[in-house]
Amino acid sequence: MKIGIINTKIRTVFSAFACMIAASLVCTMPARAVVEININKGVIEPLPIAITDFLSADQLGSNITSVIAADLERSGLFAPIDKGAFIEKISNPDAAPRFEDWKVINAQALVTGRITKQPDGRLKAEFHLWDTFGGQRMIGQQFFTTPDNWRRVAHIIADAIYERLTGDKGYFDTRVVFVDESGPAQKRVKRLAIMDQDGANVRFISDGRALSLTPRFSPNRQEVTYMSFEGGSPKVYLLQLETGQRELVGNFPGMTIAPRFSPDGQKVVMSLLQDDGSANIYTMDLRNRTTTRLTSSQAIDTGASYSPDGSQIVFTSDRGGRPQLYVMGADGSNPRRISMGDGSYSTPVWSPRGDLIAFTKQSQGQFSIGVMKTDGSGERLLTSGFHNEGPTWAPNGRVLMFFRKAAGAGGPKLFTIDLTGRNERQIQTPNFASDPAWSPLLE
């Protein structure tokens, strides 16, 4: 069945050489830069960075600069300096700036750039990252794209700056699929939607006629698996984002819930409700449609999430009374409980880095978003309140997105928080929003 509502194509429109470093622009610093951010030492002071308006024939250069600055500021690692403090006016972004003018305003890094329209209609975006106190250029790159894709250029540049200054991959050139919620609480319409990670470019990918929940990206970013109540009983579907084609993932007699892809994209793990009221975890191989049962308890086993290498699965089970977190082999072997704190645990999701598991915890009348090591040690709650739920990892494993509902009237909203728990930001959406899932970096 085709959902002919919105073209959600996410294949890059950049030319093959778009993200290559132009030889004429590169001037790399020595192996150890003077300016850098150590993101492994916990709470840090944001790095003051000056981002000048990219030279262009219209407003586009300023628009791109604004997106870059917003990306970096939202990470909590950078403090973009107000443009009113700038002393030097950049007229040639390729030339070395007057470093003393930037040191005076404590700009430890400087970004300059240019946007030009090519004869074929494409845009050429060039940028340079300067170490002002070291007096050297750190990187210079150029990209080509279509005019309607300018926001992606901004996100890619922000990722390049983030990576050069932190040593970690960025996460700005990504998308988030989520459940859009509109209408009164008693008749809430829930549609699947997709957007850029900063809340821009929202597009709907389901029509809202049937309740749709728990969307999850495939590793190739081209597919989403989700649960739909079409026909009255929840079933798991697979949606092709580029074409709108969708298919049922197994025509099981009972309800199927909580789907998620394996890291190689070849399997979907999900829970099937049994006649006795229990729920067990199954996988379906998408290549040959064979199913494998992984758990066989009388409990409710759900919320399965693979480790990045595909060798293990974390899931929620109430086999011990309250819902707790368990880890087992990807074949269902050796299940063991890892959560040992008070309260109930749910919605576990393994970090892309493999070092942590994020979760929702309900305890003492509050819902919290937390992380723990994969053996259950080192539990930390990042944020707590009336209702926080459904964490999803940025692809670099440094930031989480989740949804929050405040007490009283209203509905859920999306937020991000870093691993320090100090940098929490709301993501603006057109309506109420829940169940976010972060994509891998786009290509």
From Swiss-Prot:
A single cellular component GO annotation: periplasmic space
GO biological process entries: cell division; protein import
Cellular localization per UniProt: Periplasm
Signal peptide: 1-33
SUPFAM superfamilies cross-referenced by the UniProt entry: TolB, N-terminal domain, Tricorn protease N-terminal domain
UniProtKB keywords: Cell cycle, Cell division, Periplasm, Signal
InterPro entries listed in its UniProt record: 6-blade_b-propeller_TolB-like (IPR011042), PD40 (IPR011659), Tol-Pal_TolB (IPR014167), TolB_N (IPR007195)
Gene3D superfamilies the UniProt entry points to: TolB, C-terminal domain, TolB, N-terminal domain
Family, as annotated: Belongs to the TolB family.
Subunit structure and binding partners: The Tol-Pal system is composed of five core proteins: the inner membrane proteins TolA, TolQ and TolR, the periplasmic protein TolB and the outer membrane protein Pal. They form a network linking the inner and outer membranes and the peptidoglycan layer.
HAMAP family: TolB
Known role: Part of the Tol-Pal system, which plays a role in outer membrane invagination during cell division and is important for maintaining outer membrane integrity.
Listed name of the protein: Tol-Pal system protein TolB
Species name: Brucella canis (strain ATCC 23365 / NCTC 10854 / RM-666)
